[in-house]
Swiss-Prot record:
Entry keyword Zinc-finger: no
Gene behind the chain: BCL2L15
Any one Gene Ontology cellular component term annotated for this protein: nucleus
Alphabetical UniProt keywords: Apoptosis
BP GO annotations: apoptotic process; regulation of apoptotic process
Identification of the protein by name: Bcl-2-like protein 15
Annotated source species: Bos taurus (Bovine)
Gene3D superfamilies in alphabetical order: Blc2-like (1.10.437.10)
Length: 162
């Protein structure tokens, strides 16, 4: 069954990204969401988590800012149980800085790119902590009205370009 809500889709996508970044040796999460691309009626849905995750990785690859210090800070705060606020502030700050350098860049695209790239850095630097960052990243995307409206304005996750 395909994820129905925006929130479920976001969770599937962030988990798929983490699986990509960590590789098959790591199990992701303790909650299994159905992320297949078939609906209850047997119709194939346009929601393909692998394609969407790939597009987001391409988007993230466009960000070439320095993330080492930010990732270390997110890792440290995640270990202390404070991932949510630090993650939001870090992504917001890096996204704003990137947009200031490139006036043609939509803030929402920068936000998504930085989120993906930061998750990739955390996964590479501290794989055991990366799983704890999935929920805060998912909540950050789901809870940001501007990001949500941007994605829905594109026609949903499945129409987001990399």
């Amino acid at each position: 069954m395909s994820p129905r809500t925006f929130e479920e889709q976001t969770e599937c996508i962030v988990n798929a990204l983490l699986t990509d970044f960590l590789g098959p040796a790591w199990e992701v999460g303790n909650r299994t969401l159905q992320c297949e691309d078939e609906s209850d009626s047997g119709e194939v849905s346009s929601f393909d988590v692998a394609i969407i995750a790939g597009r987001l990785r391409m988007l993230g690859d466009k960000f070439n800012g320095e993330l080492e210090a930010s990732a270390k800070n997110v890792i440290a705060e995640t270990i202390r149980g404070q991932a949510g606020i630090v993650l939001q502030n870090t992504v917001k700050s890096l996204s704003n800085a990137w947009c200031a350098q490139d006036s043609s860049l939509a803030y929402e695209r920068a936000f998504l790119a930085v989120s993906v790239k930061l998750l990739e850095h955390v996964a590479r630097m501290a794989p055991e902590v990366a799983r704890q960052v999935v929920r805060p990243i998912t909540n950050m995307i789901n809870g940001n009205t501007a990001i949500r409206e941007y994605i829905q304005g594109q026609g949903g996750w499945e129409n987001l370009e990399g």
